[in-house]
Amino acid sequence: MPLHMIPQVAHAMVRAAATGRLTLYTKTRTETTNLDHAEYVTCGRYTICAFCLTTLAPHANVKTIQDSHACSRQPNEAIRSLVEVSDKAQIALVGSRTVDYHELDVKAGFVAPTADETVAPSKDIVELPFRTCDLDDSSATACVRNHCQAGHDGVTHLPILSGDFKLPNEHPTKPLDDTHPHDKVLTRCPKTGLLLVHDTHAHATAVVATAATRAILMHDLLTSANVDDGHQARSACYGPTFSNLTFACHSTCASDMAHFDCGQIVGIDLHVEPSD
Protein backbone atom coordinates (compact mmCIF):
# COMPACT_ATOMS: atom_id res chain seq x y z
CA MET A 1 0.00 0.00 0.00
CA PRO A 2 1.41 3.43 -0.89
CA LEU A 3 2.47 5.43 2.14
CA HIS A 4 0.19 8.33 1.28
CA MET A 5 -2.87 6.04 1.53
CA ILE A 6 -2.25 5.07 5.15
CA PRO A 7 -3.97 8.13 6.67
CA GLN A 8 -6.94 7.65 4.33
CA VAL A 9 -7.39 4.00 5.28
CA ALA A 10 -6.99 4.67 9.00
CA HIS A 11 -9.44 7.56 8.89
CA ALA A 12 -11.98 5.51 6.93
CA MET A 13 -11.72 2.63 9.41
CA VAL A 14 -12.29 4.87 12.43
CA ARG A 15 -15.19 6.65 10.74
CA ALA A 16 -16.77 3.33 9.79
CA ALA A 17 -16.47 2.11 13.38
CA ALA A 18 -18.07 5.31 14.64
CA THR A 19 -21.11 4.75 12.41
CA GLY A 20 -21.32 0.98 12.84
CA ARG A 21 -20.33 0.21 9.26
CA LEU A 22 -17.43 -2.18 9.73
CA THR A 23 -18.22 -5.54 8.13
CA LEU A 24 -16.38 -8.82 8.71
CA TYR A 25 -15.96 -11.68 6.24
CA THR A 26 -14.63 -15.21 6.60
CA LYS A 27 -12.08 -16.87 4.33
CA THR A 28 -14.94 -18.09 2.13
CA ARG A 29 -16.17 -14.48 1.76
CA THR A 30 -19.17 -15.08 4.00
CA GLU A 31 -20.26 -12.23 6.25
CA THR A 32 -19.74 -12.90 9.95
CA THR A 33 -20.00 -11.11 13.28
CA ASN A 34 -17.26 -13.17 14.93
CA LEU A 35 -13.87 -11.52 14.67
CA ASP A 36 -12.17 -14.81 15.54
CA HIS A 37 -13.50 -16.24 12.28
CA ALA A 38 -12.89 -13.13 10.20
CA GLU A 39 -10.30 -12.89 7.44
CA TYR A 40 -11.31 -9.54 5.99
CA VAL A 41 -12.66 -6.25 7.32
CA THR A 42 -14.40 -3.73 5.09
CA CYS A 43 -15.29 -0.15 5.85
CA GLY A 44 -17.09 0.70 2.62
CA ARG A 45 -14.08 2.27 0.93
CA TYR A 46 -11.40 -0.32 1.62
CA THR A 47 -10.96 -3.99 2.42
CA ILE A 48 -8.13 -4.89 4.76
CA CYS A 49 -6.74 -8.09 6.23
CA ALA A 50 -8.19 -8.67 9.70
CA PHE A 51 -4.80 -9.89 10.92
CA CYS A 52 -1.93 -7.88 9.44
CA LEU A 53 -3.96 -4.82 8.31
CA THR A 54 -2.69 -5.03 4.74
CA THR A 55 -5.00 -3.07 2.44
CA LEU A 56 -6.23 -5.65 -0.06
CA ALA A 57 -8.54 -3.54 -2.20
CA PRO A 58 -9.77 0.07 -2.57
CA HIS A 59 -13.38 -1.17 -2.38
CA ALA A 60 -15.65 -3.37 -0.27
CA ASN A 61 -16.35 -6.11 -2.81
CA VAL A 62 -14.64 -8.96 -0.98
CA LYS A 63 -15.61 -11.58 -3.57
CA THR A 64 -13.35 -10.03 -6.20
CA ILE A 65 -10.24 -9.96 -4.02
CA GLN A 66 -7.32 -12.15 -5.06
CA ASP A 67 -5.12 -11.81 -1.99
CA SER A 68 -1.73 -13.47 -1.83
CA HIS A 69 0.03 -11.49 0.87
CA ALA A 70 2.29 -12.82 3.60
CA CYS A 71 0.42 -12.68 6.88
CA SER A 72 1.26 -13.34 10.52
CA ARG A 73 -2.36 -14.32 11.22
CA GLN A 74 -2.05 -12.92 14.71
CA PRO A 75 -5.20 -11.18 16.03
CA ASN A 76 -4.87 -7.40 15.92
CA GLU A 77 -6.07 -5.60 19.05
CA ALA A 78 -6.67 -2.29 17.27
CA ILE A 79 -9.03 -3.95 14.81
CA ARG A 80 -10.70 -5.89 17.62
CA SER A 81 -11.34 -2.66 19.49
CA LEU A 82 -12.82 -0.95 16.43
CA VAL A 83 -15.02 -3.95 15.67
CA GLU A 84 -16.33 -3.95 19.24
CA VAL A 85 -17.18 -0.28 18.87
CA SER A 86 -18.92 -0.85 15.56
CA ASP A 87 -20.77 -4.14 16.10
CA LYS A 88 -21.67 -4.12 19.78
CA ALA A 89 -22.37 -0.39 19.89
CA GLN A 90 -21.17 -0.30 23.50
CA ILE A 91 -18.94 2.72 23.16
CA ALA A 92 -19.71 5.87 21.22
CA LEU A 93 -16.87 7.41 19.26
CA VAL A 94 -16.87 11.14 19.77
CA GLY A 95 -15.13 12.50 16.72
CA SER A 96 -16.46 15.94 15.83
CA ARG A 97 -13.97 18.74 15.35
CA THR A 98 -15.18 20.44 18.51
CA VAL A 99 -16.68 18.12 21.11
CA ASP A 100 -19.54 19.43 23.21
CA TYR A 101 -18.55 18.47 26.75
CA HIS A 102 -22.19 18.31 27.85
CA GLU A 103 -23.19 15.92 25.05
CA LEU A 104 -20.68 13.24 26.05
CA ASP A 105 -23.27 11.58 28.29
CA VAL A 106 -25.72 11.33 25.41
CA LYS A 107 -23.22 10.02 22.88
CA ALA A 108 -21.71 7.51 25.28
CA GLY A 109 -24.38 4.88 25.72
CA PHE A 110 -22.25 2.16 27.28
CA VAL A 111 -22.79 1.52 31.00
CA ALA A 112 -19.50 0.15 32.25
CA PRO A 113 -19.56 -2.65 34.84
CA THR A 114 -18.02 -1.81 38.20
CA ALA A 115 -15.12 -4.16 37.52
CA ASP A 116 -14.31 -2.41 34.27
CA GLU A 117 -10.84 -0.95 34.10
CA THR A 118 -12.21 2.44 33.10
CA VAL A 119 -14.09 2.64 36.40
CA ALA A 120 -11.84 0.96 38.94
CA PRO A 121 -9.12 3.27 40.30
CA SER A 122 -5.75 2.51 38.80
CA LYS A 123 -2.52 4.23 37.90
CA ASP A 124 -3.82 4.67 34.34
CA ILE A 125 -6.67 6.93 35.43
CA VAL A 126 -6.32 10.61 36.21
CA GLU A 127 -9.10 13.01 37.15
CA LEU A 128 -9.12 16.10 35.01
CA PRO A 129 -10.96 19.35 35.72
CA PHE A 130 -11.71 20.16 32.09
CA ARG A 131 -11.00 23.76 31.20
CA THR A 132 -10.52 25.41 27.86
CA CYS A 133 -7.64 27.25 26.33
CA ASP A 134 -8.26 30.00 23.80
CA LEU A 135 -8.53 27.92 20.65
CA ASP A 136 -10.33 30.23 18.24
CA ASP A 137 -7.61 29.42 15.73
CA SER A 138 -7.87 25.69 15.10
CA SER A 139 -4.60 25.37 13.21
CA ALA A 140 -2.05 22.95 14.61
CA THR A 141 0.52 25.65 15.35
CA ALA A 142 -2.02 27.89 17.08
CA CYS A 143 -3.32 25.00 19.18
CA VAL A 144 0.12 24.37 20.61
CA ARG A 145 0.93 28.05 21.06
CA ASN A 146 -2.31 28.80 22.88
CA HIS A 147 -2.05 25.64 24.96
CA CYS A 148 1.52 26.35 26.05
CA GLN A 149 0.67 29.96 26.90
CA ALA A 150 -2.33 28.94 29.00
CA GLY A 151 -0.35 29.54 32.17
CA HIS A 152 -0.26 26.12 33.85
CA ASP A 153 -1.71 27.71 36.98
CA GLY A 154 -2.52 24.42 38.65
CA VAL A 155 -5.46 23.70 36.37
CA THR A 156 -4.96 20.50 34.41
CA HIS A 157 -5.47 21.00 30.70
CA LEU A 158 -6.07 18.25 28.21
CA PRO A 159 -2.88 17.94 26.16
CA ILE A 160 -3.16 18.93 22.53
CA LEU A 161 -3.10 15.61 20.70
CA SER A 162 -3.29 16.98 17.18
CA GLY A 163 -4.23 20.08 15.28
CA ASP A 164 -7.60 18.76 14.18
CA PHE A 165 -9.03 18.22 17.67
CA LYS A 166 -10.03 20.95 20.10
CA LEU A 167 -10.50 20.67 23.82
CA PRO A 168 -14.07 19.83 24.92
CA ASN A 169 -15.83 23.14 25.37
CA GLU A 170 -19.03 25.10 25.20
CA HIS A 171 -17.37 28.05 23.52
CA PRO A 172 -13.72 28.43 22.49
CA THR A 173 -13.09 31.23 24.99
CA LYS A 174 -15.61 30.42 27.73
CA PRO A 175 -14.48 28.16 30.63
CA LEU A 176 -16.68 25.23 31.51
CA ASP A 177 -18.91 25.09 34.55
CA ASP A 178 -16.61 23.84 37.32
CA THR A 179 -19.34 22.98 39.82
CA HIS A 180 -18.26 19.35 39.53
CA PRO A 181 -14.73 19.67 38.16
CA HIS A 182 -13.74 16.05 38.70
CA ASP A 183 -16.65 14.17 37.13
CA LYS A 184 -14.67 13.14 34.06
CA VAL A 185 -11.66 10.86 34.05
CA LEU A 186 -9.24 10.36 31.20
CA THR A 187 -7.66 6.97 30.75
CA ARG A 188 -6.58 4.67 27.95
CA CYS A 189 -7.29 1.10 26.99
CA PRO A 190 -4.25 -0.91 28.18
CA LYS A 191 -4.45 -3.17 25.11
CA THR A 192 -5.06 -0.72 22.28
CA GLY A 193 -3.98 2.64 23.69
CA LEU A 194 -7.28 4.22 22.66
CA LEU A 195 -8.09 7.26 24.78
CA LEU A 196 -11.22 6.99 26.89
CA VAL A 197 -13.27 9.59 28.73
CA HIS A 198 -15.30 8.18 31.62
CA ASP A 199 -18.18 9.99 33.32
CA THR A 200 -18.06 9.02 36.99
CA HIS A 201 -21.65 10.13 37.57
CA ALA A 202 -23.36 8.59 34.54
CA HIS A 203 -21.01 5.61 34.41
CA ALA A 204 -20.69 6.16 30.68
CA THR A 205 -17.53 5.72 28.66
CA ALA A 206 -16.66 7.34 25.35
CA VAL A 207 -13.74 6.63 23.06
CA VAL A 208 -12.19 9.92 22.00
CA ALA A 209 -11.82 9.62 18.23
CA THR A 210 -8.98 12.06 17.98
CA ALA A 211 -6.09 11.92 15.59
CA ALA A 212 -4.39 9.94 18.36
CA THR A 213 -6.92 7.17 17.82
CA ARG A 214 -6.13 7.15 14.12
CA ALA A 215 -2.44 7.31 14.96
CA ILE A 216 -2.57 3.95 16.70
CA LEU A 217 -4.13 2.36 13.64
CA MET A 218 -1.71 4.21 11.36
CA HIS A 219 1.20 2.87 13.37
CA ASP A 220 0.00 -0.69 12.76
CA LEU A 221 -0.54 0.07 9.09
CA LEU A 222 2.98 1.45 8.82
CA THR A 223 4.33 -1.67 10.46
CA SER A 224 2.38 -3.94 8.14
CA ALA A 225 3.71 -2.03 5.16
CA ASN A 226 7.28 -2.50 6.45
CA VAL A 227 7.77 1.25 6.56
CA ASP A 228 10.35 2.63 8.96
CA ASP A 229 8.41 4.47 11.65
CA GLY A 230 10.70 7.46 11.51
CA HIS A 231 10.19 11.18 11.06
CA GLN A 232 9.63 10.86 7.32
CA ALA A 233 6.91 8.25 7.71
CA ARG A 234 5.17 10.18 10.48
CA SER A 235 5.38 13.36 8.46
CA ALA A 236 3.56 11.61 5.62
CA CYS A 237 0.83 10.54 8.03
CA TYR A 238 0.32 13.66 10.05
CA GLY A 239 1.54 16.43 7.82
CA PRO A 240 4.80 18.38 7.85
CA THR A 241 4.03 20.15 11.12
CA PHE A 242 3.46 17.05 13.26
CA SER A 243 7.01 16.62 14.56
CA ASN A 244 7.39 20.34 15.17
CA LEU A 245 4.00 20.38 16.85
CA THR A 246 4.77 17.69 19.42
CA PHE A 247 8.33 18.88 19.95
CA ALA A 248 7.18 22.42 20.67
CA CYS A 249 4.53 21.26 23.09
CA HIS A 250 6.91 18.86 24.83
CA SER A 251 9.70 21.44 25.10
CA THR A 252 7.43 24.10 26.55
CA CYS A 253 5.35 21.94 28.84
CA ALA A 254 7.70 19.16 29.93
CA SER A 255 8.52 20.64 33.32
CA ASP A 256 4.98 21.80 34.03
CA MET A 257 3.08 18.77 32.75
CA ALA A 258 4.70 15.85 34.52
CA HIS A 259 1.29 14.17 34.71
CA PHE A 260 1.19 13.70 30.93
CA ASP A 261 4.32 13.42 28.82
CA CYS A 262 3.37 15.10 25.56
CA GLY A 263 6.57 13.84 23.99
CA GLN A 264 5.22 10.30 24.11
CA ILE A 265 2.79 11.25 21.37
CA VAL A 266 5.68 11.06 18.93
CA GLY A 267 6.10 7.37 19.70
CA ILE A 268 2.35 6.68 19.60
CA ASP A 269 2.76 5.29 23.13
CA LEU A 270 0.15 7.39 24.91
CA HIS A 271 -0.05 7.07 28.66
CA VAL A 272 -1.67 8.83 31.58
CA GLU A 273 -0.17 9.05 35.04
CA PRO A 274 -1.85 10.15 38.28
CA SER A 275 -1.83 13.85 38.97
CA ASP A 276 -0.75 15.16 42.33
From Swiss-Prot:
GO terms for cellular component: T=13 icosahedral viral capsid; viral outer capsid. Its main location: virion. It holds the Pfam family Capsid_VP7. The keyword Cytoplasm does not apply. Keywords: Capsid protein, Outer capsid protein, T=13 icosahedral capsid protein, Virion. Belongs to the aquareoviridae outer capsid VP7 protein family. Interacts with VP4 and VP6. This is Outer capsid protein VP7. It comes from Aquareovirus C (isolate Golden shiner/USA/GSRV/1977). The gene is S10.
